[in-house]
Design a protein with these regions (language model features):
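Secondary-structure transition motif
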Residues: 1-88
Length: 88
């Protein structure tokens, strides 16, 4: 694996930030990163982790297109996005 890629299996997810807390659940989200799936597809996406207290359940999802589309394949690696182009 390229040195810039981070294996989810070996290292884990990007840093999660709490975005919503409620008495029945908490939702955490990462910033957008470049991901690669088990089928070698690549997307710019963010990860969202939901903790459901009543069910003692933890769910992790990846989303693309500003959160409108869920990534169905298993995400195996991620890398930081480069800085935005500022122009000349």
């Amino acid at each position: 694996m390229n040195k810039d890629w981070t294996s989810i299996k070996k290292v884990g997810l990007p840093k999660l930030k709490l975005i919503m807390e409620h008495e029945i659940m908490s939702i955490y989200r990462t910033k957008e990163v470049l991901i690669q799936t088990e089928h070698e597809k690549m997307f710019v996406a963010f990860c969202q982790k939901v903790y459901k207290y009543k069910e003692y359940k933890e769910e992790t999802y990846w989303y693309v297109n500003d959160g409108t589309t869920k990534v169905e394949d298993e995400v195996v690696a991620w890398m930081e996005l480069p800085d935005r182009y500022e122009g000349e």
